Amino acid sequence: ALAGTIIAGASLTFQVLDKVLEELGKVSRKIAVGIDNESGGTWTALNAYFRSGTTDVILPEFVPNTKALLYSGRKDTGPVATGAVAAFAYYMSSGNTLGVMFSVPFDYNWYSNWWDVKIYSGKRRADQGMYEDLYYGNPYRGDNGWHEKNLGYGLRMKGIMTSAGEAKMQIKISR
């Protein structure tokens, strides 16, 4: 299994994320997430909060500098109208928290794929509040395009999310 593991940051590719998607099987709404830590510090997993859907893996506990975490989410099993919508948090050795949100909706007539990343001051676990802050803040559409922003605290983000129901999201956090 790839999801729930750590790999060398330089080896984080869409091909790796394709393998993570394959592991999830025939599910109509799913996502493979890869986040490369080039921040200069180590990250420690806090938790994941699923607004909709679930995961079959545990967040990798430690993500050293120059390594990338692999994670995944999927809709609930069975004929249910849910997507894969979540926020998760990592405590950074700088004393702040990296919050990440993704949304792969069930109904594309009304919704689109969305994602965002933010650094929170101090230690903060992912919850409904973090999800809402990221989802209703200024998120990026999963539009198959690269996006960049300054995260503050001397860090930058560059990332992409695909628009499909079997989504891939790749993010790099760097100085």
From Swiss-Prot:
Phosphocholine binds at residues 52, 85, 103, 105, 131, 135-136. It comes from the Eukaryota. The record marks 110-111 as: Important in the initial contact with the lipid membrane. A motif (Cell attachment site, crucial for protein stability) lies at residues 141-143. InterPro entries: Actinoporin_PFT (IPR050677), Anemon_actinoporin-like (IPR009104), Cytolysin/lectin (IPR015926). It is found in: Secreted; Nematocyst; Target cell membrane. Residues 1-10 are annotated as: Plays an important role in the hemolytic activity. Pfam families: Anemone_cytotox. The keyword Membrane applies. Keywords: Cytolysis, Ion transport, Membrane, Nematocyst, Secreted, Target cell membrane, Target membrane, Toxin, Transmembrane, Transport. The keyword Transmembrane applies. Expressed in tentacles and mesenteric filaments. Residues 103-118 are annotated as: Trp-rich region, which is important for the binding to lipid membrane. GO terms for molecular function: channel activity; identical protein binding; toxin activity. Changing residue 106 to L: Reduction of hemolytic activity. GO terms for biological process: cytolysis in another organism; monoatomic cation transport; pore complex assembly. GO terms for cellular component: extracellular region; nematocyst; other organism cell membrane; pore complex. Residues 9-28 are annotated as: N-terminal region. Composed of a long N-terminal alpha-helix and a core region rich in beta-sheet structures. Before the pore formation, the alpha-helix binds the lipid membrane, partitions into the lipid-water interface and stabilizes the monomeric molecule on the membrane. Finally, it traverses the bilayer, thus forming the transmembrane pore. Octamer or nonamer in membranes. Monomer in the soluble state. Originally described as forming tetramer in the presence of a lipidic interface. Pore-forming protein that forms cations-selective hydrophilic pores of around 1 nm and causes cardiac stimulation and cytolysis. Pore formation is a multi-step process that involves specific recognition of membrane sphingomyelin (but neither cholesterol nor phosphatidylcholine) using aromatic rich region and adjacent phosphocholine (POC) binding site, firm binding to the membrane (mainly driven by hydrophobic interactions) accompanied by the transfer of the N-terminal region to the lipid-water interface and finally pore formation after oligomerization of monomers. Belongs to the actinoporin family. Sea anemone subfamily. This is DELTA-stichotoxin-She4b. It comes from Stichodactyla helianthus (Sun anemone). The lineage of its organism: Eukaryota, Metazoa, Cnidaria, Anthozoa, Hexacorallia.
